[in-house]
Design a protein with these regions (language model features):
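ABC ATPase nucleotide-binding domain helical subdomain, centered on the C-loop/LSGGQ "ABC signature"
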Residues: 1, 8, 26-73, 117-118, ...
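ABC nucleotide-binding domain signature
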Residues: 5, 11-15, 130
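ABC ATPase nucleotide-binding domain signature
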Residues: 10-19, 74-75, 136
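C-terminal portion of ABC ATPase nucleotide-binding domains
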Residues: 62-66, 103, 118, 122-126, ...
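ABC ATPase nucleotide-binding domain "signature" region
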Residues: 79-80, 86-91, 131
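A short, proline-enriched helix->beta-strand linker immediately N-terminal to the Walker B motif
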Residues: 93-97, 126
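Helix N-cap at the start of a conserved alpha-helix in ABC-type nucleotide-binding domains
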Residues: 110-112
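Conserved H-loop
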Residues: 126-133
């Protein structure tokens, strides 16, 4: 048994449909930290680095109020990809031991997805990152892939091993390459 406070500290979860508050982008990304940006200006530098790692910084700098931009309830002023990347930045800023991305790159183009995944490989060394995805390209550099069907584990291995196996993973991979 783990105390709930430990789980909250050690696990970050980014769902496909994430939640943003009616607040500024900087406060949305910093949400969950113990210190507020107003109390500790150094947090803004960390927010900006997390935004860069999540490939949302350039978009934010293009907004008239940059990090002070109000996003509206549930992030209505942002695109789906911008919402997902803002939530990924929030999780990266928390720097948990375990990061779970639950199809949270689905609204991001493949080039941006690739850059985010490269950044994750650099920034999350020595930590556990679980990526749940329907797009096989998201999983190409994974250490291990678990394929689930009807809630059951049907295949497990490296991406290369699963391609060689010629099962469901390989079939979907070939279909998605077309």
């Amino acid at each position: 048994d783990y105390p709930l406070a430990v789980l909250h500290r050690d696990i970050s979860y980014v769902p496909q449909e994430n939640f943003l508050f009616s607040d500024t982008l900087e406060e949305n990304i910093a949400f969950g930290l113990e210190d507020r940006i107003a109390d500790n200006p150094a947090i803004l530098d960390a927010v900006k680095q997390a935004a860069k790692d999540a490939c949302i910084h350039d978009n934010i700098m293009g907004f008239p109020d940059e990090y002070k931009t109000m996003v509206g309830e549930r992030g209505v002023t942002l695109s789906g990809g911008q919402k997902q990347r803002s939530s990924i930045a929030r999780a990266l800023l928390k720097d948990s031991a375990i990061l779970i991305l639950d199809d949270s790159l689905s609204a991001v183009d493949t080039d941006t997805e690739e850059q985010i995944l490269e950044n994750l490989m650099e920034t999350r060394q020595g930590k556990t990152t679980i990526v749940i995805a329907h797009r096989i390209s998201t999983l190409q550099k994974a250490d291990h892939v678990a394929v689930l069907s009807d809630g059951k584990l049907t295949e497990y291995g490296t991406p290369e091993e699963l391609l060689e196996l010629g099962g469901f993973y390989a079939d979907i991979s070939h279909k998605q390459q077309l």
